[in-house]
Regions:
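Two-component system phosphorelay core
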Residues: 1-125
């Protein structure tokens, strides 16, 4: 087993393609870990902000927030969550009901945050 394989194995997080994501970070695992920790710290709040924007009738803001979360999750290798954020963004853009996608997004963000925190350990705010 080479060093790269060991690193990827140590970062095995359910629902995240860590090998793909670390490659996006040019192999810089430290930088990748930093952004994973940022997601744990800010991902749930981002989902809450999307809900608040929808509840307040500011659909354009909700679209922008969903788009930003979609980009972040794609960069981090969270393929399922990326797909959910993309579907939510599309529903919002089309003026379609988004409740089911929003609920799925919120629960998946929480699941991902918990899974990441269990692998990374305590996250400093």
């Amino acid at each position: 087993m080479n060093a790269e394989t060991q690193t990827t194995a140590q970062l095995a997080i359910p629902g995240i393609n860590t090998a793909q994501a670390i490659a996006r970070f040019s192999g810089d695992e430290g930088r990748y870990r930093y952004w994973l920790a940022e997601f744990v710290s800010h991902g749930p709040a981002a989902a809450t902000q999307i809900r608040l924007a929808i509840d307040n009738g500011t659909r354009d803001t909700a679209v922008k927030l969903a788009h930003a979360l979609k980009g972040r999750t794609g960069m981090l290798g969270m393929n399922e969550l990326h797909s959910i954020a993309q579907s939510l963004e599309q529903c919002l853009k089309n003026g379609e009901p988004s409740t089911l996608w929003l609920e799925e997004l919120e629960s998946t963000v929480q699941e991902m945050s918990t899974a990441i925190a269990s692998v990374l350990g305590p996250i400093k705010a």
